[in-house]
From Swiss-Prot:
Residues reported to bind tRNA: Y17, F68, N70, N116
Coiled-coil residue windows: none
EC number: 3.1.1.29
Membership in a protein family: Belongs to the PTH family.
Role according to the record: Hydrolyzes ribosome-free peptidyl-tRNAs (with 1 or more amino acids incorporated), which drop off the ribosome during protein synthesis, or as a result of ribosome stalling.
Site (Stabilizes the basic form of H active site to accept a proton): residue numbering on this chain: D95
InterPro entries documented for this protein: Pept_tRNA_hydro (IPR001328), Pept_tRNA_hydro_CS (IPR018171), Pept_tRNA_hydro_sf (IPR036416)
Species of the source: Shewanella loihica (strain ATCC BAA-1088 / PV-4)
HAMAP family in UniProt: Pept_tRNA_hydro_bact
Identification of the protein by name: Peptidyl-tRNA hydrolase
Localization: Cytoplasm
Gene name as annotated: pth
Domain of life: Bacteria
Residues carrying the site annotation Discriminates between blocked and unblocked aminoacyl-tRNA: N12
């Protein structure tokens, strides 16, 4: 059984960024909210959109920070501190350049891999890297100098469909995580082939 109490979807705020690759984490949390039948509402105390939900029989908080990506830790830290949620009870969903569209993987701990949202969360959790991640593949533009424009751009329709399909599978794997355990959820998600 999972001990996850907070699920975070990283994003940049506003309509301008809503459909950009960098917001893949928020797409996952929005889909979880839809499955639970809850609406995320703005909460200035936590600098984000939040909801309390019963997810597969467990009480969890959903959070999409409304800070810019590089300040995500302000939101995550505020909510985690208020509800006394430990880093190993947090799952952060984020876009992942090092995996192609249609691939997603759960992971515990690790560095930030250059992801500014993760970097700020680690800093605001007193440098504790021991939180879970859901890495949602968006692919890489091929050249480091193109990364910023790439993550802030919209995926072509074929890639977008693959990202949406793997997010749907990640939601199904989250059910396995909550009803069984992380290793079974990992096996399910990591063996999934989109398309």
């Amino acid at each position: 059984m999972s001990n996850i109490k907070l699920i975070v979807g990283l994003a940049n705020p506003g309509d301008k960024y809503e459909q950009t690759r960098h917001n893949a984490g928020a797409w996952y949390v929005n889909e979880l909210a839809r499955v639970c039948g809850v609406s995320l509402v703005a909460d200035s105390k936590y600098y984000g959109l939040t909801a309390r939900a019963t997810l597969y029989g467990k009480d969890v908080r959903l959070l999409i920070p409304t800070t810019f990506m590089n300040l995500s830790g302000k939101s995550v830290g505020a909510l985690a501190n208020f509800f006394r949620i430990a880093p190993d009870e947090i799952l952060v969903a984020h876009d992942e350049l090092d995996m192609p569209p249609g691939v997603a993987k759960f992971k515990l701990g690790g560095g930030h891999g250059g992801h500014n949202g993760l970097k700020d969360i680690i800093a605001k959790l007193a440098n504790d890297k021991g939180f879970y991640r859901l890495r949602i593949g968006i692919g890489h533009p091929g050249d480091k100098s193109m990364v910023s424009n790439y993550v802030l751009g919209k995926a072509p329709q074929t890639e977008q469909r693959l990202i949406e399909e793997v997010i749907d599978e990640a939601v199904r794997a989250t059910e396995v995580l909550f009803k069984e355990d992380m290793s079974k959820a990992m096996h399910r998600l990591h063996s999934y082939k989109a398309g």
